[in-house]
C-alpha cells in the first residue's frame, strides 16, 4: 500500500500551514475538467500505473492523496514507498506513477488542486488485475472401480478465475464451470487417466495442472487362443487379460499346475502370457486353463492344443467350467506369491 511518512514534530506547524494552503476546505467539484466522474484505471499486477492529473496553471497548488493519507504535497514526497514518484512531462502535468503495482495498491486516489478561484479534485480508482494461479490441486489418486472420487483445484486471480476440468483422452469430456471440485460417482476403468484443471481469466494465459487417477479393477480375459500342432513341432497357447494392477498368470493341465520344465515354457508379461510346448507329443494334446488374478479377483479361460484335422471341442472362448476350488487355490497362491 502506498503509505505516508510522519513529519518531524519540529516541522509540524509549518507542515500544517502548508497543507491548509494546498488542500481544499470547501466542497469538491467532480473533477478538474468539470465533466468527468471518477476514472477507473486497470493495471495488471507487476506493471506500472500512471494516474493522470493536469492543472489549469502553473500557480496551482496540488496534492495527491489516497485512503492512507498524503502521498505528495506539491513536490514534497510524503510517502515512504520507493515505487511512487511524480510524472511531469510538461509544466501543467502532476501525474502519479506507481511501479510494480500490487493488489494492496488498489483503491481510490485523489488529485487535489487549489486554484485562485476554488478547490477542485480529480479522483482515479486503481483496479489491479492478477493473472490466474492454481494454488492447490489434488495429488495423484488410486481407487477401486465403483468408488466415488473428488478432485480439488483451487486458484487465485482477479477477476476470479473460471475453473475448467477435462479428462485427457481423445474423447475426453470437458466439465466447465466455476466449481473447484470435480466429483466422479461410481468411477469406471474407462474414466482412469489424467485430468486437467485449467484456471483462466482475462488477464493472461491460463494456468494448467494435471491429476492422475488410477482405477483398480479385477482381471478380464480379453483373448485366449487355442492352437493345433503336429507331433515333433513347437506350439504355443496364448492368453491375454486386462486388469489393474496387472494380473499374475498361472497355467493348469486338468487340475495340475504347470511349471516351466520338461519341455514346457511359460512366459508372462504385463497383461499376457503364453505356454509353449517345445516338442509336441501325443500326451500334450488336450485342454489347458489360463488363470489370471490380482488382489481384486480371479478369472480363467480354457484353451485346447489339438491335432491337425481334429474337431475343436473348445475354440478358445472364455469358460468358467474350472472347479471353484481350483480358482480359489490359484488366487490364494498368486496373492501369497507361492
Curated annotation (Swiss-Prot):
Q: Which PROSITE patterns match?
A: IG_LIKE
- Record propeptide residues: 316-338
Q: Which domain of life is it from?
A: Eukaryota
Q: What is one Pfam family matched by this protein?
A: I-set
Q: Which SUPFAM superfamilies match?
A: Immunoglobulin
Where are the disulfide bridges? 53-111, 153-197, 239-290
List the GO terms this entry assigns under cellular component, sorted alphabetically: postsynaptic membrane; presynaptic membrane; side of membrane
Topology class, membrane = Lipid-anchor; GPI-anchor
Which keywords belong to this entry?
Cell adhesion, Cell membrane, Disulfide bond, Glycoprotein, GPI-anchor, Immunoglobulin domain, Lipoprotein, Membrane, Phosphoprotein, Repeat, Signal
Show the InterPro entries listed in the entry.
Ig-like_dom, Ig-like_dom_sf, Ig-like_fold, Ig_I-set, Ig_sub, Ig_sub2, IgLON_domain
Biological process (GO), any one: cell adhesion
Cite the Ig-like C2-type domain residue spans from the record. 29-122, 132-214, 219-304
What tissues is it present in? Answer: Expressed mostly by neurons comprising limbic-associated cortical and subcortical regions that function in cognition, emotion, memory, and learning.
Q: Which family does it belong to?
A: Belongs to the immunoglobulin superfamily. IgLON family.
State what this protein does.
Mediates selective neuronal growth and axon targeting. Contributes to the guidance of developing axons and remodeling of mature circuits in the limbic system. Essential for normal growth of the hippocampal mossy fiber projection.
- Protein name, UniProt field: Limbic system-associated membrane protein
This chain's source organism reads Rattus norvegicus (Rat)
Amino acid at each position: 500500500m502506498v503509505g505516508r511518512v510522519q513529519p518531524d514534530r519540529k516541522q509540524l506547524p509549518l507542515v500544517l500551514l502548508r497543507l491548509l494552503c494546498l488542500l481544499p476546505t470547501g466542497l469538491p467539484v467532480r473533477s478538474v475538467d468539470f465533466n468527468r466522474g471518477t476514472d477507473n484505471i486497470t493495471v495488471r499486477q507487476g506493471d506500472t500505473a500512471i494516474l493522470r492529473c493536469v492543472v489549469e496553471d502553473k500557480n496551482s497548488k496540488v496534492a495527491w492523496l489516497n485512503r492512507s493519507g498524503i502521498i505528495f504535497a506539491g513536490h514534497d514526497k510524503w510517502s515512504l514507498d520507493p515505487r511512487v514518484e511524480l510524472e511531469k512531462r510538461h509544466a501543467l502535468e502532476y501525474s502519479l506513477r506507481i511501479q510494480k503495482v500490487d493488489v494492496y495498491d488498489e483503491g481510490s486516489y485523489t488529485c487535489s488542486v487549489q486554484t485562485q478561484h476554488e478547490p477542485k479534485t480529480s479522483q482515479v480508482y486503481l483496479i489491479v488485475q492478477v493473472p490466474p494461479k492454481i494454488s492447490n490441486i489434488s495429488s495423484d489418486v488410486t481407487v477401486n472401480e465403483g468408488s466415488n472420487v473428488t478432485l480439488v483445484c483451487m486458484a487465485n486471480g482477479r477477476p476470479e478465475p473460471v475453473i475448467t476440468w477435462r479428462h485427457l483422452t481423445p474423447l475426453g469430456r470437458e466439465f466447465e464451470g466455476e466449481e473447484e471440485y470435480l466429483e466422479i460417482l461410481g468411477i469406471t476403468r474407462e474414466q482412469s487417466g489424467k485430468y486437467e484443471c485449467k484456471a483462466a481469466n482475462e488477464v493472461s494465459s491460463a494456468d494448467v495442472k494435471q491429476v492422475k487417477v488410477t482405477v483398480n479393477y479385477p482381471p478380464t480375459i480379453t483373448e485366449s487362443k487355442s492352437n493345433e500342432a503336429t507331433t515333433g513341432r513347437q506350439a504355443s497357447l496364448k492368453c491375454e487379460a486386462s486388469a489393474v494392477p496387472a494380473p499374475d498368470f498361472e497355467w493348469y493341465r486338468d487340475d495340475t499346475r504347470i511349471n516351466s520344465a520338461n519341455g514346457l515354457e511359460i512366459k508372462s508379461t504385463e497383461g499376457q502370457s503364453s505356454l509353449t510346448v517345445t516338442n509336441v507329443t501325443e500326451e500334450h494334446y488336450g485342454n489347458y486353463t489360463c488363470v489370471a488374478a490380482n488382489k481384486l479377483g480371479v478369472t480363467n479361460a480354457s484353451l485346447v492344443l489339438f491335432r491337425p484335422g481334429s474337431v475343436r471341442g473348445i475354440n478358445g472362448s472364455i469358460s468358467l467350467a474350472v472347479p471353484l476350488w481350483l480358482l480359489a487355490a490359484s488366487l490364494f497362491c498368486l496373492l501369497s506369491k507361492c
